[in-house]
Swiss-Prot record:
Converts seryl-tRNA(Sec) to selenocysteinyl-tRNA(Sec) required for selenoprotein biosynthesis. The gene is selA. GO terms for cellular component: cytoplasm. This is L-seryl-tRNA(Sec) selenium transferase. Its cofactor is pyridoxal 5'-phosphate. It catalyses: L-seryl-tRNA(Sec) + selenophosphate + H(+) = L-selenocysteinyl-tRNA(Sec) + phosphate. It comes from Clostridium perfringens (strain SM101 / Type A).
Length: 462
């Protein structure tokens, strides 16, 4: 039986003969032959191991080959629909760019640019000059620098200003920022020496003062943006540390994390320290992210006093951590939105989603509900009140009121429906709880409605 099956396996040339010539030209004859060999070898191995009792036909081998090569050509990084209500969803790419920022990236990608060319002088320029001015205008800082993420920013600052020196930081601020990436480890790589003061829940100004030695290089303050310590607590403000630092002639570095540029508490959100407030309190160097609350591209932005920023710019690590033209293009336009606060709220998707009026979200939910009326034979839809979150390790206490579309079905349970939606050609990421699938309308975009309808229709018709 085994020998007969092995003899029945089709030859590569025979299978190639039934392929469309256009398919062979599009994929490359060698690529098709290689895929066919793998498919036939897999079938042969399965026959020998008595795992199957059949030999593929020419047509079956051809079909498998076409499917395999089609999958190989698919993008690994693809568009997904965020139905979770987590605005800055770390796993789904964090912040979305505004239309104008997206266009700027496309222009930078499709044409030559003055990335490092001074158009006035007709000679080599600096990529950082393209964006330093707008950062200074918005924050009031004397100087600025952009690197590829905030962890890189804090490491570069510490290495530039505090190599082989002691850096004093509260134990309650020795945070982990995700992916097991911890402030003590970052400090270790920077070759600065960590000096912990206070306790996890209580640190006093005298703890900082008592830790000062001749080897002290800086005070470091880290905003605990992804958690809260409540109850019997005491922390020292940046303003208090800066007053002490001025007396002792010691620089102050602050990592404020999410990069809030405007006071969002006026829009009903949790109060977060802004970059401007940090600088106004007297902090010498501030670092923050570009792709969280700021709403731009992934970047680590360093602002502060010119004498310190200039020293950081001269560090050899700066070149290793520099950003590319796409990041600069996206960040420049995002920052220019902030020249007008109203424009920033309206045009930057992250800010717009976070500050959405509840009535508008309800209107979105009703619109989706009506769009799906034709699928009532497959599902039962209902609208419920719920809560969204900011995400991105920001505002852990903030719960944003929202409206959810609940999806129930008699023919498919919530676990399988969630999986089917997640594995759809344009994946739809949802919430599952209370025995149903939910879509949070806060994070649904204009182009998502049709995809959701088509996905649910195809799943229902299976």
């Amino acid at each position: 039986m085994t020998k007969e099956l092995l003899r029945a396996l089709p030859k590569i040339d025979e299978i190639l003969g039934i392929f469309n010539e256009d398919f062979l030209n599009e994929n490359g004859r060698e690529t098709v032959v290689s895929a066919l060999r793998d498919i036939i070898n897999e079938n042969r191995k399965a026959i020998l191991n008595e795992e199957v009792d059949y030999a593929l036909t020419k047509e079956e081998a051809k079909s498998k080959c076409e499917h395999r090569l089609l999958k190989k050509r698919e993008r690994n990084l693809k568009r997904v629909i965020n139905g979770t209500g987590v605005v800055i969803h770390t796993n789904l790419g964090r912040s979305l760019l505004s239309k104008e920022a997206t266009e700027a990236v496309a222009l930078a990608a499709s044409s030559y640019s003055n990335l490092e060319y001074d158009l006035k002088k007709g000679e080599r320029g600096s990529r950082y000059s393209l964006i330093e001015g707008i950062i200074k205008d918005i924050t009031g800082a004397e100087a600025a620098l952009v690197v590829n993420n905030n962890a890189a920013a804090i490491m570069l600052v510490l290495n530039s200003l505090c190599e082989n020196k002691e850096v004093i930081v509260s134990r309650g601020e020795l945070v982990e920022i995700g992916g097991s990436f911890r402030i003590p480890e970052v400090m270790n790589f920077s070759r600065a020496k960590l000096v912990e003061v206070g306790t996890t829940n209580r640190t006093h100004l005298y703890d900082y003062e008592d830790a000062i030695t001749e080897e002290t290089g800086a005070f470091l303050k880290v905003h605990s943006s992804n958690f809260k310590i409540v109850g019997f607590t005491k922390s020292v403000s940046a303003n208090e540390i800066c007053n002490l630092a001025r007396e002792k002639d010691i620089p102050v570095i602050e990592d404020i994390g999410s990069g809030v540029l405007i006071d969002l508490s006026k829009y009903g959100l949790e109060k977060e320290p802004t970059v401007i407030e940090s600088l106004e309190s007297g902090v010498d160097v501030v670092t923050f992210s570009g792709d969280k609350m700021l709403g731009g591209a992934q970047a680590g932005i360093i602002v502060g006093k010119k004498k310190f920023i200039d020293k950081i710019k001269r560090n050899q690590l700066t070149r290793a951590l520099r950003v590319d033209k796409f990041t600069l293009a996206a960040l420049e336009i995002t920052l220019k939105h902030y020249l007008n606060e109203k424009e920033a709220i309206e045009k930057i998707p992250t800010l717009h989603m976070m500050t959405l009026d509840l009535k508008e979200i309800e209107e979105r939910a009703n619109r989706l509900y009506k769009n799906l009326e034709g699928l009532n034979k497959f599902y039962k839809f209902s609208i419920e009140e719920g809560e969204s979150t900011v995400g991105g390790g920001s505002m852990p206490d903030s719960k944003l009121s929202t409206y959810l579309l609940r999806i129930d079905s008699d023919s498919i349970n919530e676990v399988n429906l969630e999986r089917e939606l997640r594995e759809y050609k344009i994946p739809i990421i949802t919430r599952v709880y209370k025995g149903a699938v939910y879509i949070d309308l806060r994070t649904i975009l204009e182009d998502d409605y049709e995809v959701i309808f088509n996905a649910l229709k195809e799943i229902g018709e299976k």
